[in-house]
UniProtKB/Swiss-Prot annotation:
Entry's family note: Belongs to the arthropod phospholipase D family. Class II subfamily.
UniProt organism field: Loxosceles laeta
Location in or out of the cell: Secreted
Keyword list, A-Z: Cytolysis, Dermonecrotic toxin, Disulfide bond, Hemolysis, Lipid degradation, Lipid metabolism, Lyase, Magnesium, Metal-binding, Secreted, Toxin
Cysteine disulfide links: 45-51, 47-193
Protein name, per record: Dermonecrotic toxin LlSicTox-alphaIV2i
Binding site residues for Mg(2+): 25, 27, 85
MF-aspect GO terms: lyase activity; metal ion binding; phosphoric diester hydrolase activity; toxin activity
Length: 276
């Protein structure tokens, strides 16, 4: 998956897809009560990027639903996976559960439109800290009594992006109601302004490939240097988050990689662990 980073304006959806992405990452900002309010990253962000692009949440989710609904004039078949980078650090932790419920309602009614046929992209809920796990728990429990529980079970995955201890990550996911290998992505990375080693990525890949692991997929962020992309692919990641999708697309065409990797399509399940 080539994951377009910090896609927070409606027009950026097509912009990043046209550059070669098949996935996007969207930053979700919340009000002081934990209700989703805007798409917004804020300062600081990545080098050579504008950090303050924003849309009202309802407008963006409406456009995202259109872009991922077959038959809609704005449908883009390339967009198969959406990572919601949930900025849950801006409100009191006591509101985490209610915030998760509110976001579940937004997805059910504004993205899926209360239908099996709208908003077909797979979704990853990415939280910045392990102690925010009640957001995931609430999101999942919202669908316990819903006729759309099948969509939760088919289309939603989970990630913690804070580069915290992976053994503890497993424990916390279980506390949130997520079983081992139940749609679990493990991200690792840092802003593109700083070089980061692949040590933690390789550790995550080893857990993914272990018979007793809890991870389905591993993502590295945020890179765009050709050498960094090659190193990440050689580490066997499943996704790369980037500001320049064309770089990853070009590397995938190189002799060293063209027979080992291909761009994921909608037929590729982002919850299945790939085995060579």
């Amino acid at each position: 998956w080539i994951m377009g980073h910090m896609v927070n304006k409606i027009e950026q959806i097509n912009e990043f897809l046209d550059l070669g992405a098949n996935s996007i990452e969207v930053d979700i900002a919340f009000d002081e009560l934990g209700y989703p309010e805007y798409t917004y990253h804020g300062v600081p962000c990545d080098c050579k990027r504008y950090c303050t692009k924003s849309e009202k949440i309802d407008d963006f989710i409406e456009a995202l639903s259109a872009a991922t609904t077959p038959g809609n004039p704005k449908f883009r078949k390339e967009l198969t996976l959406v990572v919601f980078d949930l900025k849950t650090g801006g409100f009191d932790a006591s509101r985490m559960y209610k915030s998760g419920k509110a976001f579940a309602e937004l997805i059910q009614f504004s993205y899926w439109k209360g239908s099996d046929d709208a908003g077909r992209a797979y979704i990853v809920l990415s939280l910045p800290k392990l102690d925010h796990y009640e957001f995931i728990k609430a999101f999942r429990e919202h669908f316990d009594t819903s006729t759309f529980k099948n969509l939760l079970e088919e289309r939603v995955g989970y990630d913690f992006s804070g580069n915290e201890d992976m053994g503890l990550t497993r424990v916390v996911l279980n506390k949130a109601g997520v079983n081992d290998r139940e749609h679990v992505w493990q991200g690792d990375g840092i802003t593109n302004c700083i070089l980061r080693s692949l040590d933690r990525v390789k550790a995550a890949v080893a857990i993914r490939d272990s018979a007793t692991g809890y991870i389905n997929k591993v993502c590295f962020w945020t890179i765009q240097a050709y050498s960094s992309v090659r190193d990440a692919l050689n580490a066997e990641v499943d996704g790369i988050m980037t500001n320049e999708p064309g770089v990853i697309a070009n590397v995938l065409k190189e002799d060293a990689f063209k027979d080992r990797f291909r761009l994921a399509t909608y037929r590729d399940n982002p919850w299945e662990t790939f085995k060579r």
